[in-house]
Design a protein with these regions (language model features):
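Conserved SAM-binding loop
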Residues: 62, 82, 137-138
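Non-catalytic, surface-exposed connector residues within folded enzymatic/regulatory domains
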Residues: 33-36, 60, 83, 96, ...
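N-terminal helical cap/lid subdomain that shapes the substrate entry/recognition surface
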Residues: 1-68, 72-76
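Asp-based, Mg2+/Mn2+-dependent phosphohydrolase catalytic module
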Residues: 67-72, 86-191
Length: 191
């Protein structure tokens, strides 16, 4: 096995299954030790563990403040798209009963490159008939923040500036993401 710490684990957030496995193998100095077939089997096994873990997810697992934020955005006729690197994103939304609150769910299988490339955010904006420059992107991972910036959208980070980067609006946790806060970020961005 490969032991990882919290700091390294942050680098795995927001990247595709294959990219995260590549990063893990590189970190554990096992890069290049597996054939393509073995790598695919490892990626599948990693995903199987993850799928087993998320079977128990319920609406009670929605992060604090997210349901009220999504509801407020819907009531204000703000379009909402999911730009997750995870192919399991739609399943998670279903388990948490959030799917009806989204106008679009960008499929990571439909993009050339995963985060930190901007492809998924460009696709998400397109699916709600907007340009990235007309969008805010909310992310809890550095790779996601980089992807939002590269797309031309305005990022909002959830977490710590030490992990996400300097010079962008950051809230410490999802409960601080309110419609009023996002309006302020947008107005400051446009300002």
């Amino acid at each position: 096995g490969i032991s990882i710490d919290r700091v390294f684990n942050e680098q795995l957030k927001g990247v595709s299954r294959e990219d995260s496995l590549q990063l893990l193998l590189k970190y554990g100095k096992k890069e290049g030790t597996f054939s393509s077939e073995e790598f695919a089997q490892l990626a599948q096994r990693k995903n199987d563990y993850y799928l087993e873990m998320i079977q128990a997810i319920t609406p009670e697992d929605v992060y604090p403040g997210i349901l009220s934020l999504l509801t407020e955005l819907r009531e204000a006729n703000i379009k909402i798209a999911l730009a997750s690197a995870s192919k399991n994103g739609p399943f998670l939304l279903e388990k948490m009963q959030l799917t009806p609150l989204f106008d679009a769910i960008a499929n990571p299988a439909d993009v050339q490159a995963g985060k930190p490339a901007p492809d998924i955010f460009i696709l998400a904006a397109k699916e709600i008939d907007l340009t990235p420059a007309e969008c805010l992107g909310i992310e809890d991972a550095k790779a996601g923040i980089q992807a939002i910036l590269a797309s031309g959208a305005q990022p909002v980070g959830v977490g710590r500036k030490e992990e996400l980067g300097e010079g962008l609006p950051i809230v410490p946790e999802t409960s601080a993401l309110t419609f009023d806060y996002l309006k302020k970020v947008w107005l400051d961005h446009e300002g």
